[in-house]
C-alpha cells in the first residue's frame, strides 16, 4: 500500500469496525463523542457476529471478567457507570493460596469493592439466573446510544483494491470504509484474513487458557470466597496459575498454562487446598460450562496502515492482566489519532504507535515479574518466607505494606509493570526478604522444634 499524507475523515466519512467486543465499542464511543465535539458528521457501523444474549460460549467473549479498579474509575469519568445488572460481584481483596497456606491482601488505595466481576455474555451454559446483563452487550448498547449502527453479521472478506478497504459477507459488499478498525480480538480467523492483506500486519502471539463456570450457590460463594479473588500457586504441572473469581451463584475458574485442559481443572478441584473451599461431598459435575480461549501475550506487528488500524487484543494488550483496560487505552488512542490527526499510515505511526509501544515495553517488565513470581512459588523455602513477610505486613505488624502492594498491583493490573518492577527491586525490600530467609534458615537448623 502506498504511503499517503493528509488522509482525513471529512463529513459523511464511513467507519467500519469489525468486532463489537470492548475495543470496538470503546472506539466508536470515543470517536463518535469526539466527532460531535469537533462538529464532524461521521457514520459508524460495528459488525459483530454475536448478540451477547445467549448463555454459554456462543454468546460470550470468554474471559475471567474482572474489571480492574483503574478501568472502573476511568469508565466512571467517561460517564459509563456499570449497573448492578452487569456487576456480578464487587471485589475488595485478593487471597493467595500456596501449598504452605493462604494470605489475604487488601489495598488501602482501593475504594470500597472498587473492582467489578462481570459475565461477558448472557451467563454460563445451563444457568437459570435471569437478571444477568452481559458486559459486552452493555458497552455495545452505549455505542448504539452514541449513534453507532450495529449489524450482527460475520465479515468474511476484506478487499483493499480501491484504496478504501471494502468489507464483505457471503460475497456481498457490506460497505467501503474511509477507516477500517480491526477490533476482532485474537480468537477469530479474522486475524488471518487481515494478515493476508499485505500491509505488514501480524497478529499478536497467544497462549491457551481455560475457563470454567462452576455453580455453588450464592450463599456458599459468599461465605467461602467472600468479596475476594483467589489466586492459587499450587505447582500443578502445566499450570502457571489459577484464579477463582466469584460471581453470584457461580465461581469462574480461569487457568493459564502451557495447554490447560478440563483434566487440569478436575485435578485442581480435587487438590486438598481447593477441596477445603468446596461443599463437603462436592462432586465435579459431569458437564459444566467451559471454554479454551486464547489470551494475547504480546504485540501485533504494524497494527496500522492507510485507512486501517487494529485495536484491543488485535493490537496491543497488557500481559495477563486488564485486557479490557488495554482495549480502552488503545481504542481511545486510535480514535483520537483518526479524528484529530488523520487516518494515514504516518498519522497512526506518529500518534497511535507510541501508545502501543508503551504497553509493549511495559510487558517486558511484566514478563520478568511473573517469572520471578513463578520462581518464588516453586521453591518452598522461598515461597514460605515471602508469604510469611506478606502475612506479617497484612496483620498490621509493619507500618507499610510494600510486598503486598507489589502482589496486589501485579495481579489486579492496576499499575504499570515498570512501576511495580522498580518497587519490587528496591534494595530495602530485597535485603529485608533475604534477612527473613536467613533468619528462618538458622531457626530451622538450630531450633527445629520451635513453632513457625
Ligand atoms: C482466560 C482469559 C481470561 C481473561 N481475563 C480477563 C479479565 O479478567 N479482565 C480483563 O480485563 N481481561 C481479561 N482477559 C482479556 C480480555 O478478554 C481481552 O483483552 C478483551 O476481551 C479484548 O477485547 P477486544 O474487544 O479487543 O476483543 P474481544 O473481546 O475478543 O472481541 C472481539 C469481537 O470481535 C468479534 N469478531 C471477530 N471477528 C469477527 C468477524 N469477522 N465478523 C464479526 N465479528 C467478529 C467477536 O465475536 C468478538 O465479539 C482474559 C482473557 C482470557 C483468554
What are the residue ranges of the model-derived segments?
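Conserved Rossmann-like nucleotide-cofactor binding loop
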Residues: 23, 52, 187
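Short beta-strand to alpha-helix junction loop
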Residues: 63-66, 111-141, 189, 212, ...
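Beta1/beta-strand and adjacent pyrophosphate-binding region of the FAD-binding site
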Residues: 6-23
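C-terminal helical "tail/cap" subdomain of flavin- and related membrane-associated enzymes
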Residues: 339-452
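N-terminal FAD cofactor-binding segment of flavoenzymes
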Residues: 51-103
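FAD/FMN-dependent oxidoreductases across multiple families
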Residues: 127, 174, 259-337, 343
